[in-house]
Amino acid sequence: MFDWTGKNVVYVGSFSGIGWQMMMQLMQKDIKMMGIMHRMENVEMMKKLQAINPSVKVVFMQMNLMEKMSIEQAMKKMGQMMGHIDVMINGEGVLLDKDVETTMGMNLTGMIQSTMMAMPYMDKTQMGMGGMVVNMSSVYGLEPAPAFAVYAAAMHGILGFTRSMGDKMIYQKTGVMFMAMCPGLTNSEMIMNLRDNVTWHHSESMVEAIESAKRQMPEEAAMQMIHAMEMMKNGSMWIVSMGQLKEVTPTMHWQM
């Protein structure tokens, strides 16, 4: 089981949804410091987060995932402030299929950039002590999503990156493990305007099916994801659907 005592946690993402619920629940652990990284600060939500556990130092760092320089500068400041990073949770997610650049940048390339720039503060051969990176994907990273093809491409990319970085050779050298979470349909801001964010205008029936489907609450999904993290399975992928946790066993199609 993962020991949260004295850990420095970095969260890259918004002030809502599953990722934010994870932060609220992690504040109840005996962690040392929590750093929130996002393009805009929500002062009220930061105060609420701090109030959960006044003994944890909570800080905010502005960072734009669409700008490499912003990521580099913000992650350097966060790493120096903490000294080292134990846990990094990449929880940013947008569903804007008509804006390919933003969808890929916010969901995938920005996540990759921020992770790679955090690694010097996690890698035990550099300034880190080892740790864990958790990347938020989706069930649409495992299956096709005809109504949201661009979003699905980004989600598939997250899993490819996570599984590759979760190779045992990388873990043995760096001490950093990687995991991916694939939530199913969840009550969140992301799915409030589905009809405006489809890939094609031929997707009405697919959107209707999603809108009428049952959804889990972000709180229950967050709880299960933290449970998965505590199992410490490097390179693993987890589905969290309707509050139930299930590990994904990928099919091996090719091996060198």
From Swiss-Prot:
Q: What is the effect of changing residue 72 to D?
A: In strain: L21 and L126
| InterPro entries from the UniProt entry | ADH_Ceratitis-type, NAD(P)-bd_dom_sf, SDR_fam
Per the record, the GO terms for biological process are: energy homeostasis
Q: At which positions is NAD(+) bound?
A: 10-34
The residues listed in the UniProt record as binding substrate, with positions renumbered to this chain, are: 138
Q: Could you tell me the superkingdom of the organism this chain comes from? A: Eukaryota
One GO cellular component term: extracellular space
Q: Where is the active site?
A: 151
A molecular function (GO) term: oxidoreductase activity, acting on the CH-OH group of donors, NAD or NADP as acceptor
Mutagenesis / variant outcome for changing residue 215 to S:
In strain: L126
Q: Which UniProt keywords apply?
A: Oxidoreductase
Family that this chain belongs to: Belongs to the short-chain dehydrogenases/reductases (SDR) family.
What name appears for this protein in its UniProt entry? Fat body protein 2
Biological source species = Drosophila melanogaster
